[in-house]
Amino acid sequence: MDLSTKFDGLVLANPLMPAAGPLVGDSERLVFMKDAGCGAIVTKTISTKDAHIPRPCIYGDREYIMNSELWSEYSKEKWIEEFLPEFVAKNDGRPLIVSVGYTKEDMEVLI
């Protein structure tokens, strides 16, 4: 069965992709999502400011889960110098969508 689809000009093998969040919070998790078969990979949101995340920040029960993190707890430098290159080296060509910032400053610095 062909599940391929187009998303904003990208051709995906299937329409499944993770949301920006804890499941894609570093290069190891990005690779895990690729290996799990996602059609595209989305990073955890990267900001110009490090997040200070109070713990616990994830709550759930049998019917739902809530996450209160705003963006990555890692610096933009760690993403640019470590996580993204590590993922790209292991990627098989599937699209990588980088979630960046919340502010005008974030956009100016990160894009």
Regions found by a protein language model. Give the residues of each.
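Active-site entrance/lid segments in N-terminal catalytic domains of soluble metabolic enzymes
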Residues: 2-8, 12, 17, 22, ...
